Amino acid sequence: MRIGILGGTFDPIHYGHIRPAIEVKEALGLDKVLLMPNHIPPHKHQPNLSTAQRLKMVADVCAELAGFELCDIEANRDTPSYTVVTLEQLSTQYPNAELFFIMGMDSFIHLQSWHKWQQIFGFANLVLCQRPGWHLSNEHPMQQVLMARSAAIDTLKNPPQKHHPIHGRIFTVDITPQDISSTQIRSALAIGKIPTDALMPVTLNYIQKQQLYLS
């Protein structure tokens, strides 16, 4: 089994998260994608909504998307949501699965600042979402990591080895640009605008019913 993992504050979850995840799932032939809300994000400010509210929104989205599941492993932890700790737990939970941690290129270029970042490759593969035509400069310190671990998507045509899951590779997927951010959505909602083009109906319905993000 091949499992994608997309973490985030999801405050709120929107098409800028969902559409790239769908494109990655299709491009790599993943069996499922876990959407994983952070509880205590180590690289961001605390979310506006409670963990329970964000879990509810993500659960509602997963209920409408085939092959997507809510992962609450970080939400149930009262310590910072370090990726390496999470992936170690997931590799134990899914011992025969190949894990694919999905991240934007904007996060990858700062990977060296993450807690025990080099150990991440011992538990999972990375999937980098990038805009078509964008490339990391040769001078960037992460370029050597990318070159050393880069793998072609075609190598995934062969089924995974059940008892010998492969990790440590980096796959790059060109995704459709999404000019959407949670900050923009929160700002719009605060002044009474309804961003129907940015949110799934089930998410918007929950936000309106609970009167969230009102200033």
UniProtKB/Swiss-Prot annotation:
Keyword Ribonucleoprotein applies = no
Please state the Enzyme Commission number of this protein.
2.7.7.18
List, alphabetically, the SUPFAM superfamilies matched. Nucleotidylyl transferase (SSF52374)
Q: What is this protein called?
A: Probable nicotinate-nucleotide adenylyltransferase
Name its GO BP terms in alphabetical order.
Answer: NAD biosynthetic process
Reaction catalysed by this chain?
nicotinate beta-D-ribonucleotide + ATP + H(+) = deamido-NAD(+) + diphosphate
Where does this protein come from, organism-wise?
Shewanella putrefaciens (strain CN-32 / ATCC BAA-453)
What pathway, per the record?
A: Cofactor biosynthesis; NAD(+) biosynthesis; deamido-NAD(+) from nicotinate D-ribonucleotide: step 1/1
